[in-house]
C-alpha cells in the first residue's frame, strides 16, 4: 500500500546540500529563473518542444548546460556537473552563503537591460537601442559568466571551478573584476550611445 506523501514535506536539495528557497529581487526575471528543488539537475531536454520551455529548467542545470560550450567541454555533462558542484562548495566556503542565492544575485547583476539591434531602412543600416527580453537577459548573463570563467582558466594553472566561483562571486557583488559585469556595461554603453 502506497502512502500519500505531500511533495512540500520532502526536503529535496540541489546536490543534496543546497536549498533553493532563495529570493529573486528583479521582478522581471522572477518568472525566468526556475528555482525548482531537484537533487540531480538533469531534465534530459524535455523542454525542447514547448515554447519558452527553457524557462522551466532549473537555473543550476542551465548553468551546467552553458558550461558545455563547443570546445574542450562539448557534450561532457558529467564533467560540467562536477565543475558546478565543486564551484558551489568553493562559493559556500568563500562567502558563507547559499551558493544558489549567490548565483541568482550574479545573474540579476550581469543581465543587460538594453542592447542594440540593426534596422535597415532604404539601404541604410541604423543601430537602434532596444530593451532586452527577460529570457534573453538570463541567457546572456549565464553565457557571460561561463565565458569569463573559461577565459580565466584557459592556459592558466587555475582550475575552472575556482575561476567560475570567483566570476560568480564578483558578479554577485557587482564588482568590475567580473567579465560578465564588464560585458553588460559595454552592451548598455553602446545602446546608450545609439538611442
From Swiss-Prot:
Taken from the record, one Pfam family name reads Ribosomal_S7
Picking any one GO biological process from the record gives: translation
Q: Which GO terms describe its cellular component?
A: small ribosomal subunit
Q: Which UniProt keywords apply?
A: Ribonucleoprotein, Ribosomal protein, RNA-binding, rRNA-binding
Which SUPFAM superfamilies does its entry note? Ribosomal protein S7
Q: Which GO terms describe its molecular function?
A: rRNA binding; structural constituent of ribosome
- Taxonomic superkingdom: Archaea
Extract the InterPro entries matched here.
Ribosomal_uS7 (IPR000235), Ribosomal_uS7_arc (IPR026018), Ribosomal_uS7_CS (IPR020606), Ribosomal_uS7_dom (IPR023798), Ribosomal_uS7_dom_sf (IPR036823), Ribosomal_uS7_euk/arc (IPR005716)
**Membership in a protein family:** Belongs to the universal ribosomal protein uS7 family.
Biological role stated in the UniProt entry:
One of the primary rRNA binding proteins, it binds directly to 16S rRNA where it nucleates assembly of the head domain of the 30S subunit. Is located at the subunit interface close to the decoding center.
Known partners and oligomeric status: Part of the 30S ribosomal subunit.
**UniProt-listed PANTHER family:** RIBOSOMAL PROTEIN S7
Q: Which HAMAP family match?
A: Ribosomal_uS7_A
Question: What is the recorded name of this protein?
Answer: Small ribosomal subunit protein uS7
Q: Which organism is it from?
A: Sulfolobus acidocaldarius (strain ATCC 33909 / DSM 639 / JCM 8929 / NBRC 15157 / NCIMB 11770)
| Lineage of the species this protein comes from | Archaea, Thermoproteota, Thermoprotei, Sulfolobales, Sulfolobaceae
